Swiss-Prot record:
Recorded GO CC terms: plasma membrane
Subcellular localization(s) per the UniProt record: Cell membrane
GO molecular-function terms, A-Z: L-proline transmembrane transporter activity; proline:sodium symporter activity; sodium ion binding
Family: Belongs to the sodium:solute symporter (SSF) (TC 2.A.21) family.
Pfam families with a match to the protein in the record: SSF
The protein, known as: Sodium/proline symporter
Record field: transmembrane: 16-36, 54-74, 85-105, 139-159, 174-194, 200-220, 240-260, 286-306, 327-347, 381-401, 410-430, 438-458, 467-487
GO biological process per UniProt: proline transport
Annotated keywords: Amino-acid transport, Cell membrane, Ion transport, Membrane, Sodium, Sodium transport, Symport, Transmembrane, Transmembrane helix, Transport
Membrane topology: Multi-pass membrane protein
Matches recorded under InterPro entries: Na/Glc_symporter_sf (IPR038377), Na/Pro_symporter (IPR011851), Na/solute_symporter (IPR001734), Sodium:Solute_Symporter (IPR050277)
Length: 512
């Protein structure tokens, strides 16, 4: 999902107590990294997927934390502060999309990826599912993951650097390197297990923060009457449809379409110990998400009353959470709340680093070394996986070194890119026996191209007609579905093994 994106301009005071809290947070992450390293067996599946042994609670919060990023704590409250309750449509779309994802994608993907050659990456699953002997589908989907996630990761590093610059007055590059070092350390050594455990830990911190800040803010304002004050300041602040057209509402709501194709989220379903644990994970995960998003909305709404009440000049709405945490809380608690922002940022970075690393190792290096070498030289492949984490991180840091780099403009559209290219393909692969390799490649590429074309040439025409301002995932998703279906109908049908496998997956999923 989006990170802070813009410069954080509000300076806040930090003392030794705040630094201690941040240091304790970093120390816990390092310890978890060591734990993950000690648990490692030298097996690639273990390093990249935790050996498919992750429990439901870690699965749930890991999926949520890696999904939300700094957007939930920084971006969403800032958006609600600026536009009012109408910004909540995106939270409705995301929650509904995540909920459906647990039902429609999670069980079948967990079973099918293990059945289809024990695939540990999404491109590997596509290859095995469609018997892609030429590896065309695997290479193209792998390239999409590597390119877009490198850009995605760099935006997280930028957010981390700017947080330290804003909250502590430290040099941006120092903050960037510090965040990068900690994330690289526990991801490099601990692999998937460490990333999942840290995501769980960070998810708990994020949830506490999103509940604590709006409650304390209301206690220091007018209690529940704060919302009455917000409405009195401007009645449309609590209007769910304020300033939104039908196109605008649909665009915000359609963010949920992207969930079916986000590699760093759906890989969590692949790693759970059993598909039978998914209902428990779903209940916790969706509850966490709903409470967290509602808390973020509440931060934005209470912020509308908080800023004038405390005579604060808020130059950047995205700094609202930082300012409220520093003004309302003791520095020690303020440090904990700043750690929550770091948790949101770092949980996403680590997940994206690992997915990109697994794609480089499993989808490219294995093609060079061969399947047999991969089976007999597991430790070599684990080391390549670790080195890939380092390489991707270095590239992302290099791009992030200049925070004003124009590549930042592309990152906000990565969700749509993955959603349009992978979401339809994942659904077809899990449910339709008629899907062909040609249909899969054509649909995936066409979805990505439509998103790029829409962003570059169609959206700038929004001033002519509102329809051109439609969120790019919608046309990209629709075109991908149509192209995948039509091309599959016109090309050679897959073997009978596909229907057999689909039936087997369906039967296993139905087992209680």
């Amino acid at each position: 999902m989006l990170t802070m994106g813009t410069a954080l301009s509000q300076q806040v005071n930090a003392n030794w107590q705040t630094y201690i809290m941040i240091a304790v947070y970093f120390l816990i992450l390092i310890v978890i990294g060591f734990y993950g390293y000690k648990q490692a067996t030298g097996n690639l599946s273990e390093y990249m997927l935790g050996g498919r042994s992750i429990g439901p609670y870690i699965t749930a919060l890991s999926a949520g934390a890696s999904d939300m990023s700094g957007w939930m704590i920084m971006g969403l409250p800032g958006s609600v502060y600026g536009t009012g309750l109408s910004a909540m449509w995106i939270t409705i779309g995301l929650t509904l999309g995540a909920y459906i994802n647990y039902f429609v994608v999670a069980p079948r993907l967990r079973v099918y990826t293990e059945l289809a050659g024990d695939a540990i990456t999404l491109p590997d699953f596509f290859k095995n599912r469609l018997n892609d002997k030429n590896n065309v589908l695997k290479i193209i989907s792998g390239l999409i993951i590597v390119v877009f996630f490198t850009l995605y990761t760099h935006s997280g590093f930028v957010s981390g650097g700017k947080l330290f610059e804003s909250a502590f007055g430290l040099d941006y590059h120092f903050g960037l390197i510090l965040v990068a070092f900690i994330v690289i350390f526990y991801t490099f050594f601990g692999g998937y297990l460490a990333v999942s455990i840290t995501d769980f830990f960070q998810g708990v911190i994020m949830l506490i923060a999103m509940v604590m800040v709006p409650i304390v803010a209301m206690m220091n304002l007018n209690g529940w009457g704060t919302f009455h004050d917000v409405a009195a300041m401007k009645p449309t602040n609590l209007n769910l449809f304020k300033g939104l057209s039908f196109i605008g509402t649909i665009s915000l709501f359609s963010w949920g379409l992207g969930y079916f194709g986000q590699p760093h989220i759906i890989v969590r379903f692949m790693s759970i110990k059993s598909h039978k644990m998914l209902p428990k994970a779903r209940r916790l995960g969706i509850s966490w998400m709903a409470v967290g998003l509602l808390g973020a909305v509440a931060v934005g709404l209470t912020g509308i009353a908080f800023v004038p009440a405390y005579h604060i000049k808020l130059e950047d709405p995205e700094t609202l959470f930082i300012v409220m945490s520093q003004v309302l809380f003791h520095p020690l608690v303020g440090g904990f709340l700043l750690a929550a922002i770091l948790a949101a940022i770092m949980s996403t970075i680590s997940s994206q680093l690992l997915v990109t690393s697994s794609s480089l190792t499993e989808d490219f290096y294995k093609l060079i070394r061969g399947e047999e070498k991969a089976k007999t030289h597991q430790k070599e492949f684990v080391m390549i996986g670790r080195l890939s984490v380092l390489v991707v991180a270095i590239v992302a840091i290099a791009i992030a070194w200049n925070p004003n780099d124009t590549i930042l403009n592309l990152v906000g559209n990565a969700w749509a890119g993955f959603g349009a290219s992978f979401s339809p393909l994942v659904l077809f692969a899990l449910y339709w026996k008629g899907l062909t390799r040609a249909g899969a490649v054509s649909g995936m590429v066409s979805g990505a191209l439509v998103v790029i074309v829409w962003i570059a040439w169609i959206k700038p025409l929004a001033h002519i007609n509102e329809i051109f301002g439609l969120y790019e995932i919608i046309p990209g998703f629709i075109v991908s579905v149509i192209v995948t279906y039509v091309v599959s109908k016109l090309t050679k049908k897959p073997g009978a093994f596909v229907e057999t496998d689909l039936n087997k997956v369906r039967d296993i999923v139905r087992e209680k």
